Amino acid sequence: MDQFASVFGKAGSLIRLDCRSLEYQYFPFHPEGYRLVLMDSVVKHELASSAYNKRRQSCEAAVAAIQKKHPHVEFLRDCTMAMLEEAKADISAEDYMRAEYVIEEIQRVLDVCEALEKDDYE
């Protein structure tokens, strides 16, 4: 995503990238009166040896449970919280929490994009 932003970024805009289709959309970003702070935590991440694989397995397990009632679902991005709630009995507590986090984060991005289109920074 960093490389994508470096190549396709443009002044006064943020990019929303769909990593499945590589479609992208620009959203206006003119935060007059606000400051944006970016930080480097200097933490190195090794996906192969991190908890990434476990989190991915949790998400895949949640999708498998959701697919029992919603066979069109391929990924958590295709799910709603209502779908996840329907499958809760078939998902471990840890997998449920991880899936819930992903679905909420996807919705947060959509909400931010909608707010950016309205120049709503509150």
What spans do the regions from the language model cover?
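C-terminal nucleotide
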Residues: 8-122
